[in-house]
């Protein structure tokens, strides 16, 4: 979440040579996230990774959590998209980020629900208990639409973005009695741990990364983590003349 600010601050307040050091650090973080959390079997990114492989929610072999939580992946691809805005056109590693964004969005589109155009809360689980979730769907729609406009993604991704946006309108937007609207079915929060440690007052073993855990977290309307990306996606639709 912090990388877009990090990149913009570096570019806007530092001389190019010094700023490049921080841009390289940002790209390293994106690349290492891919390396540490990507799952070849599902072609998705796990919610988290534990360096020690000792956290109670982590796989003891590779340190990864159990599942791909959609909003975690949403944050990841939004960060890449926003960081690219800050990176100068001649920055040596810019294409590296574009390539990684394409890798991620190819998988995102693969997991887009064909019927509704939106995405489930836990992407790698097929279950009647899983639910279509609006914050991640708004994030993905925004990245698909903006990524095409900026030239990072090809036209097929624009089509997926428009389908996603229309799906959001149909699945999640509720018109209230006072004629305002609400974005419904927002996952309030999901996280992992913390486990026991010197600075942990009370471990939270409920947050174990299981599918059952994700389904236990509350769902609410108008969570800012969804409203913001939905507004951004709406602006992209308007800017590109896609709203009928």
Short names for language-model regions:
Residues 45, 119, 183:
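Short clusters of hydrophobic/aromatic residues that line enzyme substrate/ligand-binding pockets
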Residues 9-27, 42, 84-103, 109, ...:
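Structural helix-adjacent loops and short alpha-helical linkers that scaffold large soluble proteins
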Residues 57-78, 89, 93, 112, ...:
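Solvent-exposed loop and edge beta-strand segments that line ligand/cofactor-binding
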Residues 4-21, 25-40, 44-64, 81-89, ...:
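Active-site lining segments of carbohydrate-active enzymes
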Residues 2, 116-117:
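Short, solvent-exposed secondary-structure junction/capping segments
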Residues 126, 132, 141, 149-244:
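CBM-like carbohydrate-recognition segments
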Residues 1-11, 68-85, 133-149, 223-238:
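Well-ordered alpha-helical segments within folded domains of soluble proteins
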Residues 23-57, 98-116, 160-178:
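Long, well-ordered core segments of solenoidal/helical folds
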């Amino acid at each position: 979440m912090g990388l877009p600010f990090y990149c913009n601050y570096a570019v806007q307040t530092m001389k190019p040579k010094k700023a490049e050091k921080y841009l390289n650090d940002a790209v390293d973080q994106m690349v290492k996230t891919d390396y540490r959390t990507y799952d070849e079997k599902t072609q998705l990114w796990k919610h988290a990774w534990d360096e020690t492989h000792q956290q109670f929610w982590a796989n003891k072999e590779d340190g990864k959590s159990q599942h791909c939580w959609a909003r975690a992946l949403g944050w990841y691809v939004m960060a890449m998209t926003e960081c690219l805005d800050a990176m100068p056109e001649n920055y040596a590693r810019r294409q590296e980020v574009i390539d990684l964004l394409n890798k991620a969005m190819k998988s995102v589109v693969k997991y887009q629900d064909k019927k509704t155009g939106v995405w489930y809360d836990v992407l790698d689980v097929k279950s009647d208990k899983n639910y279509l979730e609006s914050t991640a769907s708004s994030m993905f729609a925004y990245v698909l639409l903006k990524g095409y406009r900026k030239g990072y993604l090809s036209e097929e991704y624009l089509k997926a973005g428009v389908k996603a946006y229309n799906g959001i309108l149909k699945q999640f937007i509720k018109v209230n009695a006072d004629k305002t609207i609400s974005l419904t079915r927002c996952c309030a929060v999901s996280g992992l741990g913390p486990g026991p440690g010197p600075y942990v007052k009370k471990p939270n073993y409920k947050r174990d990364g299981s599918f059952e855990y994700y389904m236990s977290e509350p769902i609410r309307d108008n969570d800012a983590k969804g409203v913001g990306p939905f507004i951004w996606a709406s602006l992209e639709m308007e800017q590109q003349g896609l709203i009928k």
